[in-house]
Amino acid sequence: MMRAIYLLVVVCWAAAANASSDTVPAEVQTIVKTPGHQYDLYKKMVATISLPANANTEIHKGLNIKRPDNKVTKADIELYYWHKDLKYAVTKFLHLINDDGNKEELTAEEFSNDLQKLAFKVALVECHYQLSPGLRQACYADEILTYGALVLESDDITKFYKHLDNDKDNELKTEEVLKIQHTHKNKDNKIVAEELGAYSGAKKDTVTPEEFEEYVTQESIVDDFRECRSKKATEGTTDYDNVCLTNELVEYVNDDLTEIDISLLYRSVDTNNDNKIIIDELKAFTGITDDVKAKRILELLDMSATTPANAKPVVDYGEWRTYLRSPTVLLQLERDCAMKHNDQLEEINCMYKLLKNLLIDEHDPIWLEAWDLDHVILFEIFDADKDDGKVFKDDLKKIQKNFHFKTEATVTRYMVEADIDKDSFICLEEFDEYMDIPHMVYGTGECILHSRTKPDERGDCFVEETSDVVDNFKFIENAAFDTWFNHYDTNHNNKIEKEADGLLAKFNNDANVLTMFLEETGQGGLTVEPFEFNWYVKQQHLAHAYEDEKIVTALVQKFTAEQITKLHTELIKYINDEMTERDIEDLFDELDHNDDHELTQQDFPDCWNDVKDLLTHIDALIPEGDEDTTVNYLEFWAWINHPNPKKPQELIKKTFETDCTTKHATQKEEVACYVKTFKTKDKFKTA
């Protein structure tokens, strides 16, 4: 995901002087180096996740669409699915959850044993933090069905294992893992061998078929495998491409935050090894000496809805895992650590150091990001009757007066936009997706600092801002963006590629403009995927531009050829003439020589005196930041979009645009010019 898209929720590191170590404790280093011990730790951690005694009953209620017959049938599950690509899995799920693959109905008791499996427990843990019974039931049902629909079956796993086990002796050895053939460049399988070997419960550098099956059915990896299904799978059969599965496995272990990573990091902080991170352990980890701040961090991490107000906050494994897997934290851990290291201990040490800095920084997602928990709180305010985990139009009408939905027309429009599957109600999954679109991320950002312990206060802010966004933006449906993307996909292969037939002509045969377009929308490469294009053109700035130009005047389901021509003109104008979000990010990265996500004296060894005053000024723009001449990305972005002291009628970015944006044909030239302009101190006098 682009940093520009998540500007308000982006992780920004703050400088913090503390005495805590930047490496994991010695005990954890020993665990990393000893085959099998990591897996033992992971099993121990997951075993601490305690599902409520009535979890199987709540799952049953969530799935039992045809209540009150108290039996979950195949028809119930078919009704439950609105995911088009999961419908094939109904029979597969029933086969997974009970021993009789032909059985087409289940009682609540038949869920009990399966819910104790490691992967199921991990998949369900986040549902504990739902507040109302109806919403918790819906969450349980959705998680268990989604996991059950995607997980590989035993026959597929056996074929996958044999594909990797070259000598067919049912022992996948380190040397065999190291020789795995895959298409990913710069991945040497070392860390794959380390993690798979560590997962072996036999304390040896081989992995048995049983151990392998347990690994590849982890909740966090199964979704990666879904694209490896053949088209036959959608018709009810299972057929997987083993080469694709191999590539996904290599990429997961190399580039993703794995379950073993999460358990190692938890153990690194929970030094008492009692499955409770308490205030003293957090202070030792972060180096924080302020009890008030340390307690506040623990309160934000402690997501249990049942924790009494006067109780001491503690963080269990499920809450820790939920925090690490929140979108922005996950992005940072994977991008800055997992993707940059091919040694497991180096990777864990990197994550350990990064997490320490994240928790210290008051601009970290723990302080600023709308977590899923925030969406749950807001969803439950919207769900006025609190009985079914669904928001109907009547629910919104009930809260209209109290929570500032301005008119009934606003309520109607909100239902049209957020009800993705058009079944006349909004479920949590639809609501969460709607609240994550850039318009809403920006519009509701200021609400996030409201106390999480006062849902009504936070909810009031969210609903009011949501109403404003709904009233003031002309939303464009995803299908419309597909038509715009298709305008550039001249080879009709679901990619925008520089050498595609006819593409250059759409840019008036100007190769420089085409290259800039590809570099911007594709985040650096010269091939643009649909999701990259869609995220780019949904930026808040561009959304305003569409409306200012009267391109979009109502809810749009499909762009016309005339609209696409206007949209293209506006987009190219933005890329060519303005300092874009991508430009700001590239400038920051170019100035950040030591790649520590902050600008300090170390980044300016030859011109510190020229930029010291400017950095001090930038750091002071956001009062919550430490005024120590250390500038993180959020502060830097705020300065770029701040009025110029020399020309108050213009934003700082105007100087960069005048000096660079309109004068250079390539992104590299532009960024080099931005750097030169930044280091010219007279451009931005702060006195």
Swiss-Prot record:
Expressed in salivary glands where expression is strongest in type III cells in the posterior lobe of the principal glands (at protein level). Not expressed in midgut, Malpighian tubules or epidermis. Keywords: Calcium, Metal-binding, Repeat, Secreted, Signal. It is found in: Secreted. GO terms for molecular function: calcium ion binding. Disulfide bonds: none annotated. Its main location: secreted. Ca(2+) binds at residues 592, 594, 596, 598, 603. InterPro entries: Ca-bind_SignalingProt, EF-hand-dom_pair, EF_Hand_1_Ca_BS, EF_hand_dom. It comes from the Eukaryota. GO terms for cellular component: extracellular region. Residues 1-19 form the signal peptide. Residues 152-187, 257-292, 406-441, 476-511, 579-614 form the EF-hand domain. Binds calcium. During feeding of the phloem sap, protein is injected into sieve tubes of rice plants. This process may suppress the sieve-element clogging and facilitate continuous ingestion from sieve tubes. This is Calcium-binding protein SP84.
